[in-house]
């Protein structure tokens, strides 16, 4: 709020640059090599999510759907073969970034309690939820677009790929 579309675009570009730079940080040089388990990040995460869902169902907390059961069958067979490992934030989003007060420069990324070693694309996927979640004003589509200046998901992913040399 309170910024024009051009400024908003620059803010999103700065956020994407910080997101793209994070996996380049050498965890071993920072003595963080034991900060999380190396490798198999997606396999571990999908197993954990499915265990949590099963526990919620067993306790009556969840009303699991057929779609969730389909997802439970689909996930283990579609884990990406590229198993890069880097520092991931775990909650990388605009609200966890402190910007310079008068320019679109990231000063700090805050709220690190979910950080671990994992696959760099996990933070990218989380950061792109804005393009897929339904807001209070309804689903995002041509009739209800994101605020002016926020790049399309395709443009955001393309710029991330240019910055990192990898794509989703």
Q: Predicted regions span which residues?
A:
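Short catalytic/ligand-binding loop motif for oxyanion handling, primarily in non-cytosolic enzymes
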Residues: 31, 116-118
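Activation of the activation-loop gatekeeper triad in protein kinase-fold domains
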Residues: 110-115
């Amino acid at each position: 709020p309170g910024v024009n579309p051009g400024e908003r675009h620059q803010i999103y570009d700065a956020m994407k640059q910080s997101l793209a730079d994070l996996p380049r940080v050498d965890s071993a040089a920072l003595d963080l090599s034991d900060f999380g388990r190396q490798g198999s990040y997606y396999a571990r995460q999908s197993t954990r999510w499915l265990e949590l869902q099963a526990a919620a169902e067993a306790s009556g907390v969840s009303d699991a759907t057929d779609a969730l059961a389909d997802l439970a069958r689909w996930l283990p067979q579609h884990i990406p073969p590229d198993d890069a490992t880097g520092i991931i934030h775990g909650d990388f989003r605009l609200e966890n970034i402190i910007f310079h007060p008068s320019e679109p420069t990231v000063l700090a990324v805050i709220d690190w309690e979910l950080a671990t070693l994992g696959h760099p694309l996990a933070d990218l996927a989380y950061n792109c939820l804005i393009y897929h979640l339904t807001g209070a004003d309804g689903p995002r589509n041509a009739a209800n677009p994101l605020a002016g200046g926020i790049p399309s998901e395709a443009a955001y992913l393309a710029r991330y790929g240019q910055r990192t040399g990898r794509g989703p």
